Design a protein with these regions (language model features):
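Amphipathic alpha-helical polymerization modules
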Residues: 1-78
Length: 78
């Protein structure tokens, strides 16, 4: 294997590592959003949660779902 092939392999490995780090960051972002969604669902399920508050929580839940969709769509661009 010559020096140019070694340089190319090292570059390829560095690019793979960068991509894995970017994917890891995106997955961590999705995990945070899912945790918030779980918290919203728990709040909405409480008996003392009023219908207007439940509607606000549901609105935030759907907004977070949209954010997850955006993050998931961005994974294809990596």
């Amino acid at each position: 294997m010559d020096e140019q092939e070694l340089d190319t392999r090292e570059l390829d490995e560095a690019q793979r590592q960068e991509k894995l780090q970017a994917l890891d960051a995106k997955l961590a972002q999705i995990q945070e959003l899912l945790q918030r969604m779980e918290n919203l669902a728990q709040l909405a399920s409480r008996p003392e949660c009023t219908p207007p508050r439940r509607a606000r929580l549901q609105g935030e839940f759907h907004r977070l779902k949209g954010e997850i969709d955006q993050v998931a769509d961005s994974l294809w661009m990596l």
